[in-house]
C-alpha cells in the first residue's frame, strides 16, 4: 500500500522558513499500483512522454520484484489495473500484458543501486533536444538547483538496451547520479520515493527548455553561487517534492478519475 506522508496539524507559531507542518493531502488512500498509474498520467499530461515510449519501475517490495507499465499503452492510458509486476529478471509475474523489451535498463540499475527505488525513463522534447547535441543544461534558475551536482551525460549511444549485459554497462556509466541524459536518446531519473522521482522528472524538461532558450539568446546566464544552489536543492527535495506530488494527484483525480481503476 502506498503510504501518503503524514500531515501534521498547524501550530500557532509561524514556519519561519522551515518545513511547513500543515499541507493539503491527496485526500484518498492509494495502492502502489494506483500511485504508479497516477505517476504515468501526471508526467504524460506534463509533456514528459513520447507517445507509447518510456517506462517507470518501482521496487516497492524487498523481494526484487518491480512494478512497471505494460508495453503498448500510452502513459495517458495507464490505469492501476494495467500495472504489471516483474521479477528481478524482467519476467512478468502479475498482470495481463507484456512489458517493454528494454526492461534491462531498469532491472540492472535497480540491482546496482538499491537506493534507486523508482526509475523513470522517457524522451521529453527539450531533454532530447539537448541530448541530441550532447549538451548538459546550465543552472540558470533556482529550480535548476534540484539537479546541482546530480546531472550527468552518457555521451555514447549504443542503441536499444536489449539484454542484461547492455543494461549492466549502462548502470555502471550512470553510477550514483540520479538524473542522467542519454545522448541521442532521453533521460533516466531515479529516486528513493515515487514523490521525488515524479518531481525530478516533471521538472527536467522545463529546466532544459530554459537552458535551450538561453542558448538562443547568445548570452551567459547570471551565476548562482554554489552555497545558494546547495541550499535550494535541499529545500526543493524536502519541501517541494511531496506537495508537488499531492497537488498533481489531486488535479489528476478531478480530470482522470478512471486512473484508479
What residue ranges belong to the model's regions?
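Glycine-rich flexible loops
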Residues: 2-261
